Amino acid sequence: MEEERGSALAAESALEKNVAELTVMDVYDIASLVGHEFERVIDQHGCEAIARLMPKVVRVLEILEVLVSRHHVAPELDELRLELDRLRLERMDRIEKERKHQKELELVEDVWRGEAQDLLSQIAQLQEENKQLMTNLSHKDVNFSEEEFQKHEGMSERERQVMKKLKEVVDKQRDEIRAKDRELGLKNEDVEALQQQQTRLMKINHDLRHRVTVVEAQGKALIEQKVELEADLQTKEQEMGSLRAELGKLRERLQGEHSQNGEEEPETEPVGEESISDAEKVAMDLKDPNRPRFTLQELRDVLHERNELKSKVFLLQEELAYYKSEEMEEENRIPQPPPIAHPRTSPQPESGIKRLFSFFSRDKKRLANTQRNVHIQESFGQWANTHRDDGYTEQGQEALQHL
């Protein structure tokens, strides 16, 4: 009773929560509260009153469960996607800047080559003129006037200044080219660092997705286990109540029969009750096809072991997919953005909400079976009135086992 009150309070608090704060546990609490209300309606009006309504309510609760689970996972994925898009845009901008810089360097190099070619042609022309002058000078007389000597000296000085200017221009352009090369190397290092950062963020994103899927699988397994245990507990309590009611009716009937027989039969009445209880225990242990063959703790252990195995299998599958993706990346050797993983279409397993409502319908079937057993017990009471004895005969024990 305390557990039922606690679950009812949890469901009411879940109904009062804000829509953005709902969790999967709140959805299951709401489903439990709706199931209890359905059970009350079935007890009062029968199963036909909600036969068409129950599947629709179950479907609505399943849709709510899926939406709540997506709402909790979506913000983290959106942040990671925005970060990845931002890094891609930065990378594209840097690549574009690098291309522009390369084009500028090519233009500067072309200009420098053109100027150097012009200067070389001028030097060749001056050297040719110098040779011609030297040959002319050798053929003429050695007697030069002072004016001619000064003129020749002025021409050589002008050529020397031109050569000096050309050398300065060439050195300056060489320094500029070296500076541009250093700047280009730094830009390439920045691009490589950004690519490494992008690959690291992609791996972190993949690990986070893997962890989110594992946590979702574990949460769903725990929720399903809780629902199954609650349903088993409810069925056990209802079975205990029905068995107690049957035992009370049998005892009242036997006490009424023995009170009519006088003083001798009340002395044997406790023995009869003990034999009834023993016979009922034997019948429950041997003839009941639905008798418990294991304890509740064993059932919990089996469910826990099954959930652990499921989570391990899921982890191994994710690791295998991760290693396969790494091998593909190593084969390609080109950092590419990861493809958007589409969820694989697989048959949807039965949700905990359907399982919960199936337990409620199963309880109604058990109540119908208990009513049938009460009818059989009344027929057995008539048979016992006709075959009274000091103790139960073998036929009476067989009838109890049948019950």
Swiss-Prot record:
GO cellular component labels: centriole; centrosome; ciliary basal body; cilium; cytoplasm; cytosol; nucleoplasm; plasma membrane
Keywords: Cell projection, Cilium, Coiled coil, Cytoplasm, Cytoskeleton, Phosphoprotein, Protein transport, S-nitrosylation, Transport
Biological processes annotated in GO: cilium assembly; epithelial cell morphogenesis; nitric oxide mediated signal transduction; protein transport from ciliary membrane to plasma membrane
PTM: S-nitrosylation is required for the interaction with GAPDH.
Subcellular location: Cytoplasm, Cytosol; Cytoplasm, Cytoskeleton, Microtubule organizing center, Centrosome, Centriole; Cytoplasm, Cytoskeleton, Cilium basal body
Coiled coil: 76-258
Biased composition (Polar residues): 394-403
RH1 domain mapped to chain residues: 10-97
Known outcome of mutating R300 to L/E: No loss of interaction with RAB8A
Modified residues annotated as S-nitrosocysteine in this record: C47
Effect of R293 to L/E: Loss of interaction with RAB8A
Principal localisation: cytoplasm
Segments forming domain RH2: 291-356
Gene Ontology molecular function: any one: small GTPase binding
Ranges of compositional bias, category Acidic residues: 262-275
Record note on what altering K310 to L/E does: Loss of interaction with RAB8A
Modified residues (Phosphoserine): S7, S259
InterPro entries for this protein: DZIP_RILPL (IPR051241), RH1 (IPR034743), RH2 (IPR034744), RILP_dimer (IPR021563)
Subunit structure: Interacts (when S-nitrosylated) with GAPDH. Interacts with RAB8A; interaction is dependent on the phosphorylation of 'Thr-72' of RAB8A. Interacts with RAB10 and RAB12; the interaction is dependent on the phosphorylation of 'Thr-73' of RAB10, and 'Ser-105' of RAB12.
Job of this protein: Plays a role in the regulation of cell shape and polarity. Plays a role in cellular protein transport, including protein transport away from primary cilia. Neuroprotective protein, which acts by sequestring GAPDH in the cytosol and prevent the apoptotic function of GAPDH in the nucleus. Competes with SIAH1 for binding GAPDH. Does not regulate lysosomal morphology and distribution. Binds to RAB10 following LRRK2-mediated RAB10 phosphorylation which leads to inhibition of ciliogenesis.
Disease (UniProt): Oculopharyngodistal myopathy 4: A form of oculopharyngodistal myopathy, a muscle disorder characterized by progressive ptosis, external ophthalmoplegia, and weakness of the masseter, facial, pharyngeal, and distal limb muscles. The myopathological features are presence of rimmed vacuoles in the muscle fibers and myopathic changes of differing severity. OPDM4 is an autosomal dominant form characterized by slow progression and onset of symptoms in the second or third decades.
Protein family membership: Belongs to the RILPL family.
PANTHER family: RILP-LIKE PROTEIN 1 (PTHR21502:SF6), ZINC FINGER PROTEIN DZIP1 (PTHR21502)
Protein name: RILP-like protein 1
Gene encoding the protein: RILPL1
